Amino acid sequence: MKEEEIANLGPQEYFNYLEGINKKIIIELKTVANIDTAKDTDNLQNILIESSLALEHNIRNLLYFVDKCPISYDQIVHYHSHFKEVVKIFFQVCQDLIKAAQALILNSCDYLTTSNFAKCRGEAIKTIKNTMATCSNFEKLYYNPDLQLEDEVDLVHQQQQKEQEQQQKEQEQYEQEQLILKQLKEQELKKQQEQQQQQQQQQQQQQQQQQQQQQKHQEEKEKNDQKEKEEKLKKQLLAEQQKQKQEELERQQQQLQQQQQLLQQQQQLLQQQQQQQRSDPIIIPPITLKTSQSDLLSGGLSPKVNSPGSPNLGKFTESAERVANFDRGTANIILNMNKIKEISLSGDSEQAPEIVTAARIISENIAIISKELRYKTLGTNLSEHFVSVVQVARLAIKNKSDQFYQDQLELAIEKFNDTMRKIIYSVKSISKSSMNLRQFGVDESSLGRSPVVSPEKSISPSFTSSTSERILSHEIKNHNNNNNNYNNSSTNNLQTSFSTPSLSSNHSQQPNQQPLQSPLLINQLQSTSSSSSSSSSNLSNSLNSIQLPQATTTTTTATSPSTSTSTSTSTSPNSSSLSISDQDKQLKRKEKQHQIVIPKDVKDSVANQQQQQQQQQNGTTSPRNNESSVTAATTTTTSTTASITTNVNTIPNFPPNKQLPATPTTGTPSTSTPTPQTPTSTSQNDKQNENNNKENFVDKQKTLGKLFSKFVHKKRTPLPGFDSSNSSSPSNNSNTTNSSSHSSTNSSPMETSPGVESPKITKSPSQNNILVDSLDIGSDNQQQQQDKLTTTTSTTTITINNNNNNNNNNNNNNNNNNNNIQQQQQQQQQIPTTPNKLSNSIAMNSSNRLMTPKKERSFTIGLVSGKHSCVVVETPKSKKLFQHESAKQILSIISMNFPSFEKEFQMQNSEVISNIIEQIGNVIKNYHDEVSESSSSSSSSTTSPNNINTPSDCSPILNSENSKDSHNLSSINNSSYDPVSPALRKMYENGSYDSKEHSRSSIQSKITRKLGTIRKKGPSPFNMLLNSSTGSLSSLYLDQLNGGNGDSSSSSSSSYNLVGGSGISGYDNQNEIDASEHLVSTSSLFTEEAIELVSKCFEASIIVNHSGGTSSEIKALFSSTLDHLESMLQSSVNFGKIDPSSFCMTFLKNIRQHIPTMKSKGGKCDPTLVTAATKLFRHTILSNLDKSIHSLCHSVRVLAIQMTIIVISISAKPWDISSQLQLFASAKSFIDSLVSLLDAVENKIYISTNTNIQDDVEVPTIDDTEDTNIWEEADSPLTFGWISDEGSKTGRYVPKAGTLNKLISALTQDNKHDISRYTKTFLLTYQSFTNPWKLMEKLIQRYNVPLDEKPDVRATTQLRVVSFMQTWIERNFNDFDDQLIGQLKEFRTRLLMDNNNDLAVILGGLIKKKEAERSLSKERSTNHLTFPELMIPDGQKSPTALFLLLNESEIARQLTLIDFNIFSKIQPTELLDQSWNKDSLKFKSPNVIEMINRANKFSFWVSSQILWQEDIEERVKVFEKFILISKYLREMNNFNTLLAIFTGLNTAPILRLKKTFALLSPNSLSIYNSLEKLMNSSGSYKNYRSVSKNPPLLPYLPVILSDLTFMEDGNPDKINNLINFQKRELICRVISEVQQCQQQTKYEFPVVEPIHTLLTELPSSTPSELYQLSLIREPRETNQSNANSSISSGSNFLSNSSNHNIGNNNGFDTLKKYYKSSNNN
């Protein structure tokens, strides 16, 4: 109603209008106040909107009518004004009620919203009643003004009554306060009395404790005195016992000397008889242990500083036994783990009980090993990994065909092996012994570095002292146990013992040892000479009788397994054969009963005896050999191994009627070895052998470590720390023997437990012998290449020599040398050629014996062979650290040979050393690249099994057999030589120095080699297809090749020559070859410059003092990279022969237009980010920029690999338009990522170097009230409200609203409310209403308590301030920059000045700890920040083709890993103030924005993957694949990626594909519908919220962000100029849920390549391009006829050939068949 109409109204009409408006208001108010939340929320929302609008409109009308009142109200003016104010208040109350109702609809279950709504509704009802009453009073007083006097009198009486009531209340409160004060004083007095009593009690207790301690000290002193007396007595007894033992040893030595004299006499007689009876000699195998003085010293018999041995014999024996126990336990564990793995991977359920036995043995050995460990955590970790291996092995046997369990088994075994390697390292560092592992084929050098061995050169043996000392310790121990036998022995018994071979019954074991032992022959002491007195004094008595005729060395296993051999006469072959068979049966029977474990040398000796018996029975004899010896094996290491064979002395045979001299028996099983009868050599041969004695006894070398690691992990995974390479030589032997000889020769290398079966290593007729390594005896001798043993043993058998003092002994020794070599050759020829299960399918030739790198664990995922991208083990042989390792090896060799160089090298600076290493590394890299390129160029030729090329990851310098460097390294790298100088060890351990440079060169070489696989195509199909076409078609194509110009001059000058006549045109085959080469060259240039650009950007971001030259260099390289990208795209179009009028060319045109704009935009600073980089947020922005730069560098590298794969797929299928579309999409993503990288680098450089924005900008204040001192602010109400916990009846009191000073005061005061929860909420949300600087200022103000306050209040307040600071530092240390930390330190000094030393110490220690953690993380991020190793998949398939072949479940796992990695990085401050929606605050939420951007990219990528497919069947296949991926994502509770897929499937270009939807299977549709119902957005994702979300969980982030948005918009930041802290409480609940998901969720899926690399970056077409593709795939029904004639399925230029009499389908099919045939050829 207008003003004129209102002015014409009378009083009655006016009041009637007011009454009508009031009725409408009451109706609408009832509607709003009585909202039923149980109904549908959508209808409630509509009803609320309508009623709220009507309510506000009617209230405004009422206010308008009151303001424009037409009647005269001069007598009651104040009533009119009062009526007007009441209506205004009512309007505000109604607005609050409407907001509360809206919040109630959104969250009806929240206690805060319901209570707030009820409160607002009550106030609205009260206000409407007051309004109606005011209106009625106004009407009454208008008609009767005299009533207002009565009202005034009533008002005066009411005011007086109120004043009296207030006075009474104040008096009552005052009395109550006094009572409370009295009670408090009484309580304080009681507390003081109690404290005094407690102090007295404590003093009494302390006195009692002191008396008890004094008594204990006295008792301990008495016990120590008694122990010292007992030890002195024990020492005296031991000294007496040692004297007695020495006397006994002297007696025994005298007896032995007498026996030697008798033996010498007998030998002289035997030599005379031997000349008469040479036809039938009987050779007695020698039994003495020959050593020389030089070998004793070089072999380590003399004690060293780092040796486990010591002059005290008892301690030495104990340490040797402990080392032996550890060695046996380690060997048993490795072999039994091999058996478990073999049985599990084979899937044989019948062998399941064997897993139990092997597991039992492993558990026993783990217990033994754990006793020797200093770090007990290693033992517990080993036990845990072992239990997991057994559990997974059982699952693998049950599920034979499931690849997943086999992969899990390999992962568990890898963890177990890694722990074993750490245990070996720890024990090695404690015991200082390196021989404890060599006897089992494991070398200490193989655990920490790569072996450098030249197979053509021999390495001089050098052993540590532990082995030789163990030999002598066991000799003395066995000698002391058999003293009685020696005292009773005589010459007759000595003679008879030679002819009676038997197994000794003295086979006993010590309780702490395992049954892998073979005690030494006691008679070895006969062969030592008196010259050994220079060794240790405690061992001199046992070495007085040892003779040293020649320099020979012997090595043994853990307890030096050697056997005493004896022979029988030729007249009794039957008896000897019976004894041999009986002994063999006894040994096998005991081995089956688990009583003993037969050493390998015993088995070999029994096998040799059986072979020789069969040869005697068949009448075969050796033509030249007159003596035999026990087969000698060697102890081996992974890098260097020495093979030592001792001299053999022969004794002429006795007459048949005489007895042979006897040898004393030992405590281990021994066997008799019959030898064939051979004639002796001539004197000339003896002289020649004498002259060549030194050459024939050069130390031999074999390498078993490589083969040992093979049979430990013979299927897939190498043991970490061991090399997996093997070596072999050509097989020159074809003779075979019977099964008995075969079973004996191929025995186990270490039969340490009954649960381990011996792996048999044999040779196959189609393969070479898999040998240990060459046994090089001499450089010019031809026998050194034939003397290579096909064995896998790591034990050592000793050829024992008997010494004679006559001149004939030397001749016999020389004869034995040649005979040993010939016998080894014969034994090699007798090994049967059976296939080997443990060896590789292709053996390498000796000329190509290379150090192949360890391969990653590979397995099949779907139909593509992939690999786990495991963390690289920190060893020098890592691919990334190749240059660094090689350079330091070179420097180490120089420093070891030239001490002066090492001294000067130590004095140099670290920068100088790094430059030297970098220069050497570049030289090695250049040579490596040259060799790798030459090898890759020749890789197309077929290689035979004997000719295997060098892997590209190996060093050509270290692998070259003819290289002098390789020879030098291998000759120096023996068992006693450490290739790393002590001065360089620190550098050697810091292996990540130049990993960034090598990572760049590595990926460049990978991409270059991959592009080199593009094969040149043969004759073009167009020569056949274009015979019937006109010349305009060729001219059109040549136009397109020349850049689209249609003039004839450019066509005639083109390199694509025209060949034709009579109007028929074509082009030469050379054109297609040139196109292929141009595509490869442009792609190679692009990738090289792209990777170089990434490296430059990353280096520039690390350097703080950035120069302008580097920036200009980056921009120039950026421009050149985009130019090469454009050239590569044009080359791919030319190679694919794309029609210029095709829609594909429009995509290329868009990218060409996009490149110049990006060139101008790249490398620009963001003004918003620069202005935000003030004192408050500078350190946060720089930290986020570092993370963003690293992420973008990785993205560019991944996109480069994807583009490489796409280019290769285009070369394989040029007709495939989908590959071209993928290339264009990847190129656009590459450009955008590269521009973002340049912008980030430029922003960091500018913010880091510009001093104007660092410290000069003042911190802005948020409110003027904050400047008031916290102690000077007037008292304001700070009420605490009750908030209930969700889903329970519990709750707590929290402050509703207050000023900043009052909120901080509530944090630091003593009250009954929940301070811990309040503190958590405050720390999570305080940056939404203040900043860290202001909070620090207020806390310092709170600490400065005024002097007027009581001392108790002062102390408690200061304590709570420091306690809150401690909590703040522990939880939110990222809030502190360097300047704020400086204020903290100043506050700490203030604490010291105030005598709060305890608080200062606590605060200072926490600050130091957090600063150390921050500096350590910065060092890791700068020095050790590396990019993950990327994998280029095999084959010539595009990423889309690979995606179709990959397994859906594995794709879901990798997507979950990628998305959860981003989600776990979200910080609480990123979820405040809606910073992700505001441009000025986006720098605060980098991870939230990254997750939003990835979800958007992922949705477009899903749509692109479907629309890139030309055939509708392929589109249906991709669609169903995404549905299956969504199903697996739902099972993993990955709702974020799940909804991203549904967003991509519900875009407009996809929803219009009706034909595609019609072909979906019913199963796929049911899954799609169920998941769509779950993720429906109706009711604010009601279905999604109702689902139980148990960890692991990846929630849908947009739901969380929408909840935060409603909380921010629906609740004001301040209420009556007070901070609304209840709003922060609501926000804290959401943030706490996010933190709970981050902490409780752990997706322990392995990173699998190439899936992970392909899914890291998701290039897609633009929305307009997608819609254009959608129209092409399924045109509109109205334009269907036109679309079929103009748009072809292949978009190839042959599709427009209908005018040239070429059919569309025929031409396209012919082209496709041609390319397929050319690829197959």
Curated annotation (Swiss-Prot):
Phenotype of gene-disrupted mutants: Absence of the phosphoprotein gefR.
Protein name (record): Ras guanine nucleotide exchange factor R
Record InterPro entries: Ras-like_GEF, Ras-like_Gua-exchang_fac_N, Ras_GEF_dom_sf, RASGEF_cat_dom, RASGEF_cat_dom_sf
Compositionally biased intervals (Basic and acidic residues): 216-232, 687-701
Key words of the record: Coiled coil, Guanine-nucleotide releasing factor, Phosphoprotein
Superkingdom in the source lineage: Eukaryota
Any GO molecular function: guanyl-nucleotide exchange factor activity
Described function: Promotes the exchange of Ras-bound GDP by GTP. May also play a role in the activation of rasG.
Region span, Disordered: 213-232, 445-515, 551-701, 716-766, 797-837, 929-981
Parts forming coiled coils: 148-279, 802-831
Domain Ras-GEF: from-to ranges: 1447-1676
Gene name of this polypeptide: gefR
GO BP terms, alphabetized: Ras protein signal transduction; response to differentiation-inducing factor 1
Post-translational note: Phosphorylated on threonine residues.
Bias-annotated ranges (Low complexity): 454-469, 479-493, 501-515, 551-581, 628-651, 663-686, 724-748, 797-836, 933-952
CDD domains for the chain: RasGEF (cd00155), REM (cd06224)
Domain (N-terminal Ras-GEF) ranges: 1291-1411
Species this chain originates from: Dictyostelium discoideum
GO CC list: plasma membrane
Biased composition (Polar residues): 618-627, 968-978
